[in-house]
């Protein structure tokens, strides 16, 4: 229903470094080089991470050991029967439609293969190869940073990961290992619950005639930058058995990707960092990776949702509020550096929430560890909601009106093309 400008077609030219190429075979190779090294942003931008270490794991004295249990045929059969037949095949060319139609026949041997992976702590290499499609998201068509990589993994790897993810999340949730301020990719949590929690805290402070200041933290290529060694250490601290750790070590090893577009395929390149894009396990593993960052918030409040982090605090004195926020922000930055996650200072913003209290035209700057001043903004889009400094939601309402107007206009212009059944729905 939307007229989307995003395109998966290759550009006529692409710039990598100081070189611009128009040869399409070189364009897909350059895209692959760019996407496969996206997770190196921290290493390239930071010569040293001195005085920064990964945040300490929260104490969990009675955490039981976690080991994989055998996957059942009935569960695999259900997964296969629920496959979307219109999804693309991965580099193994195994079509989801074929697996769906043959589910009752292939479920048993596939289940045996999955369980053999647990026993051997090995995953077939074909399941660790991704086809990446560059999707233009706007801006300079020559700039590879203006393209979003859409990763297509083999269908069987996603079926397998779905079963693994259920076991992992059951263990994590049953032992309440996730922080209460972590809402990303958890059952019963979501953008709505996270936004409501933050807004409730801010509105409560405003109603008490207190100042409230927030930092909206943006990380550069966060999912692509996950350090596998640190993540394995996190899993170990959460009670994962040696066999599980060996399986996850193999899961990350020897991953490759190729760029695929317009019938062409680049050569494979190794991907040595990050959680696999498009995977089922990736979001859960990323939540594990950043979970204990919340411990560094100190006197401020924090909420985590995937790679969207808000740090905020309030009180009767603006100077004290900003001082506390700066102290907490420094500690959070050290934690992110310890995880080798790079702060995107240009996209990290500050906001003062205030309806009636006197406030200076130029409040005290909140600065990064590198000495850059963060920009104060009056409007910011947080988890899909446009927040303004007075919490009037006027900006959000205007965006909704514009979107509704556009979609109603589309329906009106194309009403003659709709079937009678479509019109009735």
Identify the meaning behind each predicted range.
Residues 373-425:
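Basic, alpha-helical interaction scaffolds
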Residues 219-305, 314:
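Conserved polymerase palm-domain catalytic core
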Residues 164-182, 283-316, 419:
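Active-site palm subdomain of RNA-directed nucleic acid polymerases
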Residues 1-146, 159, 373, 381, ...:
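Surface-exposed loop/turn segments and immediately adjacent short secondary-structure elements
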Residues 66, 263-265, 327, 341-378:
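Short, conserved micro-motifs composed of acidic
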Residues 86-94, 143-152, 193-236:
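Conserved catalytic palm subdomain of right-hand nucleotidyl-transferase polymerases, strongest
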Residues 46-76, 122, 127-131, 170-217, ...:
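Active-site-proximal segment of RNA-dependent polymerases
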Residues 129-132, 148, 182, 214-222, ...:
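Catalytic palm active-site di-aspartate
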